[in-house]
Amino acid sequence: MFRGATKVTLDAKGRVAIPSRYRDRLLTVAAGRLVATVDRDYCLLIYPLPDWEEIERKLVRLPTLNKQVRRLQRLMVGYATELEMDGHGRVLLTRELREFAGLERQAMLIGQGNKFELWNDERWLKRRDEWLADDEG
């Protein structure tokens, strides 16, 4: 299980280091192989490869005549990019993924059980505050 919020830094090449507390699990369950894709909230979703493959199988079986399904398939499968942790626990994010999520130097990695969300740090704080305000209303 992946849980918790961690501030992370992207280096000049677009690599982000996965926090050490998650690395052993990712090496065990996925041999350090991950898949990143986009989310409607303009963040990235990062799954261990075996979990992503199960999601992808389900996505491609959905009825493609449904407009919402096609949009979801185009975004999630279309942007899906395999990542591999290097010896330092870093993964290289493509320029397209970084631009989609507005990732520059500082980011937030949010554990979501079976996956991570990777957010532009300012966008994360804004959305978090909006969600908290919604709960108060």
Identify the role of each PLM range:
Residues 1-6, 12-13, 22-83, 87-88, ...:
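Flexible "stalk/tail and boundary" regions
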